[in-house]
Swiss-Prot record:
GO terms for cellular component: tRNA methyltransferase complex. Belongs to the class I-like SAM-binding methyltransferase superfamily. TrmB family. This is tRNA (guanine-N(7)-)-methyltransferase. Its EC number is 2.1.1.33. Substrate binds at K111, D143, T181, D182, Y183, E184. It comes from Mycoplasma mobile (strain ATCC 43663 / 163K / NCTC 11711). The gene is trmB. It catalyses: guanosine(46) in tRNA + S-adenosyl-L-methionine = N(7)-methylguanosine(46) in tRNA + S-adenosyl-L-homocysteine. InterPro entries: SAM-dependent_MTases_sf (IPR029063), tRNA_(Gua-N-7)_MeTrfase_Trmb (IPR003358), tRNA_methyltr_TrmB_bact (IPR055361). One of its GO terms (molecular function) is tRNA (guanine(46)-N7)-methyltransferase activity. Catalyzes the formation of N(7)-methylguanine at position 46 (m7G46) in tRNA.
Length: 201
């Protein structure tokens, strides 16, 4: 669902110290990145639970990013930053490699002509490879079964290793440390099981 722009709310992005605006930005290797972080529900919960861990959100929609910053400030988080950007530009604006990349409930772009927009299409995988450390892991959650199977195939064809996969995250061992996104809460409340995978290059 499209979010109505709120230009007054978006002004926070120009002044808040949690927003990264000077590039290139040097990441610490232990930084955990969430790409397409939305309102930051999952990553803020992780940051609150792990105060010594560094987190970075990447969200291109300015109004949604503003809502995430409001949430981070309400929780008084100091171990999280946000970049407002399209994912395609990441290698131009960040330096160093990280150990964990989260893809959470990405747009599945179901039409074949939009395959190149899927965040697990080969061009995106090539992008992630450039800033993921050799021992790094990509973690993906989605309610969309077709997108999940597509992602498994795309990653395998790219030469990635599937380290773990399940079609029912909430009834798996991985749920012990799981924090839910807004979409995850919505779909799981309706009885939809959540797909999850971990993969490396």
């Amino acid at each position: 669902m499209r979010v109505r722009r709120d230009k007054n709310l978006e002004k926070i992005l120009d002044v808040d110290p949690l927003v990264i605006s000077k590039f290139p930005f040097k990441l610490k290797q232990d930084t955990i990145i969430e790409l397409g972080s939305g309102k930051g529900t999952m990553i803020s919960a992780l940051a609150l639970k792990n105060p010594s861990q560094n987190y970075l959100c990447v969200e291109r929609d300015r109004t949604i990013a503003s809502k995430a910053i409001e949430k981070f400030n309400d929780l008084n988080l100091k171990n999280i930053n946000l970049i407002v950007s399209d994912i395609q530009h990441l290698t131009e604006i960040i330096e160093n490699k990280v150990n964990t990349i989260w893809l959470t409930f990405s747009d599945p772009w179901p039409k074949n002509r939009h395959e190149h927009r899927r965040l697990t299409y080969k061009t995106f995988l090539d992008l992630y490879k450039k800033f993921l450390s050799p021992q790094g892991v990509i973690k993906l959650k989605t309610d969309n079964d077709k997108f999940f199977h597509y992602s498994l195939e795309s990653m395998s064809e790219f030469g990635m290793k599937i380290l773990y996969q399940t079609n029912d995250l909430h009834n798996s061992i991985k749920n012990l440390d799981n924090e839910m996104t807004d979409y995850e809460k919505k779909w799981s409340s309706l009885g939809k099981s959540i797909n999850y995978l971990e993969a490396s290059f």
